[in-house]
Amino acid sequence: LQAWYLRSFNGSKRTFLNANGNGNDEQSFSNIANVFGIGAKYQIGESAVLTLDYGQNRSKFGRYMNGNTVYDHERGTADFTVKGHQMGGTPHFWMARLDIGRADIDVPKSWNAFIDYKYFAHGSFLGGNGTGAVPDRYLDGIRSFTFGAGYVPRKDLLLEAFYTFDAKGTNKRDTLYGNESFKLGDYARIQRTYRF
């Protein structure tokens, strides 16, 4: 069981302008992250592990990113009047992952396999995921499944494959024609790691 906290400090002030009628609304932020998280890891037998994580970004910037643009739109026309920005709720994330085996680069013929589910509300993910399985784009405002496997055919060589599917937006995103739901395509990655 673990708990953690991440906070940005001494950051420069960032200002965002949002159109509102004929003018702009201004939002300024100096604290990007104020993240609280908890996690648990449970060993199942000798070779399986279940991992669960949950967290929230409680900064004003996180709520801003989780919000959306407000439009005045007459149905059946292409006319939109932008009416500013609406703050969203506190963005949160959670993930569940099941790992079986352990691909150890020092142990030939060792292997691993995993499946996970991820949910990251827009504004909860701050970049740099450390997974190797998916790019950052598949973690910001997205929910998805990933499965993967690794195999060590000989010492110092690790082969891995990952497949992310059913990646969908957790909320509507701003587009030129108002807020729209979206879905990303599936994502596959194969990689080889050799240790010299």
Mark where each language-model region is.
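Alpha-helical scaffold segments of alpha-solenoid architecture
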Residues: 1-2
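Outer-membrane beta-barrel pore domains
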Residues: 5-196
